[in-house]
Curated annotation (Swiss-Prot):
Site (Cleavage): 134-135, 365-366, 380-381, 437-438, 453-454
Positions of short motif PTAP/PSAP motif: 462-465
Record region (Interaction with membrane phosphatidylinositol 4,5-bisphosphate): 73-77
Name the UniProt record assigns to this protein: Gag polyprotein
Originating species: Human immunodeficiency virus type 1 group N (isolate YBF30) (HIV-1)
Amino acid sequence: MGARASVLTGGKLDQWESIYLRPGGKKKYRMKHLVWASRELERFACNPGLMDTADGCAKLLNQLEPALKTGSEELRSLYNALAVLYCVHSRIQIHNTQEALDKIKEKQEQHKPEPKNPEAGAAAATDSNISRNYPLVQTAQGQMVHQPLTPRTLNAWVKVIEEKAFSPEVIPMFMALSEGATPSDLNTMLNTVGGHQAAMQMLKEVINEEAADWDRTHPVPVGPLPPGQLRDPRGSDIAGTTSTLAEQVAWMTANPPVPVGDIYRRWIVLGLNRIVRMYSPVSILEIKQGPKEPFRDYVDRFYKTLRAEQATQEVKNWMTETLLVQNANPDCKQLLKALGPGATLEEMMTACQGVGGPAHKARVLAEAMSQVQQPTTSVFAQRGNFKGIRKPIKCFNCGKEGHLARNCKAPRRGGCWKCGQEGHQMKDCKNEGRQANFLGKSWSPFKGRPGNFPQTTTRKEPTAPPLESYGFQEEKSTQGKEMQENQERTENSLYPPLTSLRSLFGNDPSSQ
């Protein structure tokens, strides 16, 4: 568990593991929270060894408390864990983290020094209303002093420009680094940018346009200024070209103040928006999800391009609600439309999480195959080639259906399966009733039948008795035979048989 796991032992460890993380929750503090707190202290450049005692925890709490208002969630979690650890070291009975924070707050109020006279209290109240934003800091004498930007801040700004060029995330980074800066500080940040001089020239043009517009909307008052009154800043004063650092500080700390630093920042942000638009020529309308692209990557590209769009927040919200679903691939679009128009981004990400995976691809392939097979089946049915349900197989050995003769369990029947006689097979059977094809050959049922062979059915002979004979039928048959013989004699007398060609051609060459 590491060296910091031995901070608590015995009864203190039992008390630590009995405290709930949240009021009414089920999770409690464990040893891993101590290890995490020690690592976080090292990350914040604090001494983890102070966690061993109550006084050390108090020092850490006093050091972290001023950063709670602007700190991250990790910093708040670290402060809460140290507050609980302080109560455990001090043997203060608590049940959850909120009770520990309340105990710490009570102790701080008890040790808070009271003002000696009402005037000091009023002065403290007045000082609390004065802005102490960096880089303008108030001294002990009540004077506002300017502190220039640190090299670390300038280095971070230059590194962002070198790595990100002018991507959409440069603007939030500039806003964070230039918080409370004067126009001179902002010019210092812009002058540290070595490359991208074309972009810097575009930025200067935007600043000049905004300065000219400021001069048109804020004309110079007529007449001399009263003694001791500051002059109104011009556009060039706000840009820091015709004003000194003392004048800028005086404008920013006057009553009422003139925020020349914030105004200049707003002009710079307008110019950066144009530069980002130039460096990101892709329109939000062109961001479409690929057929195999995960929905998460598509959303990342969509919002990154949306940040570069020069539009109001209402227009961006409309783009998100409409184009995000409209430009998705057909698979994701079908799922997103099923969610409805009021779906959140988390619900969309969850619904489209499996799209593009192996399971989804297999399902899509199965649906495509089924759609291809359906029209093929209908075509065969229309042409008459669709046989429908197959006839059940029949055994030639026992005559039952459901199996073949080679799988029949009945005793093997010998001989021909057609006539029952032995000595030949069914394909060689020559008994009467055998069908023949148009070539006169016997047709075997195991071979294909010619398509032009008419199918005949075997009919049974009638069982009625034969007709009675009265004598005239035999006479009629004999008379027919005599007439046929007389006709043949007549034909022979008219056309004698030609034994040679002499009667036709005279001398027959063949007889010579």
